[in-house]
Regions:
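Glycine-rich, positively charged N-terminal anion/phosphate-binding segment
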Residues: 2-5, 10, 19-91
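General secondary-structure edge motif
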Residues: 10-11, 69, 104, 111
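Conserved Rossmann-like nucleotide-binding pocket used by diverse enzymes
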Residues: 15
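Short glycine/proline-enriched coil/turn segments at helix->beta-strand junctions
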Residues: 36, 93, 133-136
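Glycine-rich, proline-tolerant flexible connector loops at the mouths of alpha/beta enzymes
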Residues: 44-51, 101-122
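Alpha-helix-loop-beta-strand connector modules within alpha/beta enzyme cores
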Residues: 61-69, 116-136
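Short glycine- and Lys/Arg-enriched binding-loop motifs that mark or flank ligand-binding interfaces
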Residues: 72, 98, 110
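Short coil-to-beta-strand
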Residues: 92-102
């Protein structure tokens, strides 16, 4: 006999991790009806690209009709850039904002963020603190 225990009743969350070029709004729209309580993630968004976002850019991050838990993942190596990106996206209703500190993606290749942050805990902490302070 098979026993099914809902993850939520165990205090467990099911996350769909960020996948570059995949976890965009279209995939999230497909996944949400399949598992409404799943915590979905955006692709890694470069903080520098969110310095002066247009309304169209912001809508692509979280369309007005998108519901359910959603995490915005930011990639960046500068505290000022990350803080600015957090402020720019503050009104979009993300449940969490995550600092990418482990991505091996070629998108971060040679950059001072992503997996390279694993080598410098003090710097990673200062970036996370800048993001938290910007969020208020």
């Amino acid at each position: 006999m098979a026993v099914s225990i809902p993850l939520a009743s165990c205090g467990v969350q099911f996350h769909v991790a960020p996948l570059q070029c995949y976890t965009n709004q279209h995939l999230r729209a497909l996944l949400r009806p399949l598992c409404p309580s799943a915590v979905l993630w955006t692709e890694m968004e470069k903080a520098e690209g969110l310095q002066r976002p247009s309304a169209v850019d912001l809508r692509s991050l979280r369309p007005d009709d998108e519901r359910g838990p959603l995490v915005l993942q930011l990639g960046g190596g500068g505290a000022t850039q990350l803080a600015s990106a957090v402020r720019a996206t503050a009104g979009l209703g993300f449940d969490e904002i995550n600092l990418n500190a482990g991505c091996p993606s070629v998108e971060t290749g040679g950059a001072s963020y992503g997996a390279s942050l694993m080598l410098d805990g003090h710097r990673t902490r200062s970036l996370a603190e800048a993001m938290a302070e910007a969020h208020g």
